[in-house]
Amino acid sequence: MDNEENEVIDLTEILSAVRQHLLKLIFVTLAAALVGFTASKFLMTPKYDSSALMIVNTRQDVNANVTSDQINSATKLVSTYSIIIKSDTVLQQVIDNLGLNLTYAQLNKRVTVAAVDDTQVMKITVQSDSPEWARQVCEQIITVAPDVIKEAVEAGSVKVISNASLATEPVSPNIKKNTMLAAAVGFVLVIGIIVL
């Protein structure tokens, strides 16, 4: 019984303390949110993604009838083709073709290749602070990759089903998320100070 009374008293005291410092709580929360918004909007460099889709086939004659076994085999080949696309054989050629002032390792970090929902479709994504640069590099990758893959694997092919996109909105920073996170940190900080 005493424990219950103590808990009620403690909760009442906490709520009373919060009410006494309500203006401070609101001010700090809003100030923290403003800091988060300002940092995201003006201090962080926006990053843009450009993506293209390619479909993997186990045979070079893409017009022939395709069996379910061939589709399964093509799905398994996606990981192999992903490694080839990110290899220096492809990316160095992209660097040379576009005259990029980047090393292979630097470009490799900006490129991701992944299967789309465990299908035979690959998504190639290039990230940059310039949406046009990202699109150009992504477009060059899907231009160079098919011939390199065909030569390396000797059986099978890849076909572009969606060309490189031009981003209109950055993928990061997430201004709304960062603002809310900063506000939450400010709120919790003040609550902690009040309670302690």
What are the residue ranges of the model-derived segments?
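Hydrophobic and amphipathic membrane-targeting/association helices
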Residues: 1-196
